[in-house]
């Protein structure tokens, strides 16, 4: 398992790297934003621990650049920026988790274990329900065989709902599995992405395929629900 630690404070970076190396990971380190982007675009990493306040290039810009061509590598933001707006921006830009400084190494290692476990869970290539089909490899969505353009988070929501057909999925579950975090303050972000997803699907299908069951959560509408 190969990790990259991007952190401009050398003492913190080296301490994290040593802890993860001792835990059995192969670890590279980088203290500069521009150098980090070069590493990321030329090497293959399973997970990146990414600071935001970096010399040379801001961590958020690095993340956005990465996600233009790579949705598979896990990214855990580790930053002193602790405002809700910072967390929302980071998660919406494609981070899988967001951890504030100061932090405990044990918690960081636990989050890394959780993220890397999820990466290697075997999934069906295509998930289907009625007129909806989601290709988990190509990350493409079809409704009545018409390709629909969805954002990264909308795809994540739809994928998780299709993986859990037949039961409502709570906002807390979506937060944990789509955003890889469990922060109550992001429930508004879920509603925004959910509303957009439902509108896009309804425009093609002619009906809203997602039910909101009050007090329970969201689920894909099935024949028994119509």
Label each region the model flagged:
Residues 1-119:
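N-terminal/domain-start alpha-helical segments
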Residues 35, 215-219:
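Glycine-rich nucleotide-binding loop
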Residues 43, 106, 130-132, 137, ...:
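Structural detector for helix-capping/boundary residues
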Residues 113-126, 166:
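The C-terminal output helix
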Residues 126-128, 133, 168, 191:
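Short aromatic/basic micro-patch
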Residues 128-155, 219-226:
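A structural micro-motif at secondary-structure boundaries
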Residues 140-209, 214:
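Positively charged, aromatic-enriched patches within helix-turn-helix-type DNA-binding elements
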């Amino acid at each position: 398992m190969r990790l990259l630690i991007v952190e401009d404070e050398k003492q913190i970076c080296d301490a994290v790297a040593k802890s993860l190396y001792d835990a059995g990971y192969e670890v590279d380190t980088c203290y500069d934003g521009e150098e980090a982007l070069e590493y990321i675009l030329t090497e293959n990493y399973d997970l990146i621990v990414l600071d935001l306040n970096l010399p040379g290039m801001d961590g958020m810009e690095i993340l956005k650049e990465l996600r233009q061509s790579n949705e598979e590598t896990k990214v855990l933001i580790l930053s002193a920026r602790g405002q809700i707006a910072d967390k929302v921006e980071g998660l919406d830009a494609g981070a899988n988790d967001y951890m504030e400084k100061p932090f405990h190494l044990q918690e960081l290692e636990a989050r890394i274990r959780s993220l890397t476990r999820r990466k290697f869970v075997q999934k069906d290539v295509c998930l289907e329900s009625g007129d909806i089909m989601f290709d988990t490899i190509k990350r493409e969505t079809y409704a009545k065989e018409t390709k629909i353009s969805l954002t990264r988070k909308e795809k994540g929501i739809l994928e998780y709902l299709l993986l859990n057909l037949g039961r409502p999925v709570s906002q807390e579950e979506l937060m944990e599995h789509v955003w890889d975090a469990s922060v109550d303050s992001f429930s508004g972000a879920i509603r925004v992405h959910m509303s957009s997803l439902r509108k896009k699907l309804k425009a093609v299908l002619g009906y809203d395929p997602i039910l909101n069951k009050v007090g329970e959560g969201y689920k894909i509408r099935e024949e028994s629900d119509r």
